[in-house]
């Protein structure tokens, strides 16, 4: 597993992002059955990426919380739903409930989540590379949006691009 340097990751993604976004736009319009390729790409990326070496998602992004997430975490912290919401969360312009600020208040100094076992559903699924609805993720621009934050997403999209180069 390669050592991750966020600065070099950022430079790398900035060079590649326009081509990769164009690839994802093409992919969204294609009729290719993606799940088989996505499963293979997902297996391969975790041989090269260690999330704890990065935690950029927790430092630069915020999950979308479900009401169930908020109840579960609030109960764990000994707070009411409203107390937890008022202290840590806000509702954004899309009506999604998100963290009030970044980095995430649950990110430890060691890049580990201090509520890992009860973390939000969105965090559990991130970077969404092992989903059954890959086409939906491509069409909804999940990977396009995550590309500049997440080395695993970058590698996933690059692997898909390599696998599908002769099919698009």
Which residues are covered by each model-predicted region?
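Short loop/turn segments that flank or connect secondary-structure elements
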Residues: 1-168
